[in-house]
Amino acid sequence: MKKYCFAVLWTLLIAGTPPAAIHHYLYVAEPGVRNYLQYGGHGLLVFDMDNDFKFVKRIATGGLDDKGQPSNVKGVAVSLFTHCIYISTIQSLLCLDLETEKLVWEKKFENGCDRMSVSPDGKTIYLPSFEGDDWKVLDARTGDVLHKIVTHSGSHNTLYGPDGKKVYLEGLHSNYLTVVQTSDYSVSRTGPFFNHIRPFTIDSRQERCYVNCDSLLGFEVGDLHTGRMINHVDVKGFQPGPVKRHGCPSHGIALTPDEREIWLADGFNEALHVFALTATGIRQTGTIKLSDQPGWITFSIDGKYAMPSTGDMIDAKTKKVVATLQDETGAHVQSEKIVEILFDGQKPVRAGDQFGIGRRGSFLK
């Protein structure tokens, strides 16, 4: 009997511990709708995407204003190189370790911060000032400034291209999308578009950009090779009206990861409009009603879920709401700053993006 027990023990030792299954979590930074605390309070809320988006925990963060109150969260991004998640507020940039869940550093920057982006290799951050004149290029490990790019465009939203060679910069006061070559910081532009650009997205091959514009219930398409606007799309069957935030009818746009559809936010009508991207053109195919006015939208990496800022989690295939984000008190959670992270045990191994980007190319599969 002793020999049998020893043999079983030895077999377990040499076999090792069975590998942990990859688990999908949604990280939600709050306050993620202006500085309103009624939509989830303050902190980093974690939801289990493999278990009907059930609330898991709340991680304490920083990001307080000069009066000691939680400041507006402006962006969220992940670096697997540093194993950290980054949260920008109007005043500062925070770096939190995803494994220890402790604040590594928080830095305030002159002229504030807005929605930043982390390079695919996780080593560099492009950080806009708060609706200001410039973007700062940072070392992701330390937050130290490496370079500054001045556009005078009302710096606002930032998106790294999937190959790491280009970064896309959107300013609130410009009809052009600025494109930066990361090798030498040279700048080009795509546009002009219908009006000042708001949220946008790109395909995986970085051939097309899809942009919201001020005063447009719809979107426009830009050719990133020629630098020209090539298509204008209006929402059919709906009229714009007063919106609670952002001042434009459509503030939120995303590509499905397979790049077959565009999903578009409609604030006044509390809806998402879906458009098919076909060889013969762009075709409006449906509308999904939401619980509130959407101000942002992204997708899960695998394309299974559409995730608007309203907290209504949508099955991307059936176009039905399948879950609603709720915190530990049962309160409805909303945020425009969310990102998916995959864990192998306690280790982060893959991250999504706050932007709903195309993933059909080899870089993002």
Describe each region flagged by the PLM:
Residues M1-Y4:
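Positively charged n-region of N-terminal signal peptides that target proteins for export
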Residues F6-A15:
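Bacterial N-terminal signal peptides
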Residues G16-K365:
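Predominantly soluble domains enriched in secretory-pathway, periplasmic, or organellar proteins
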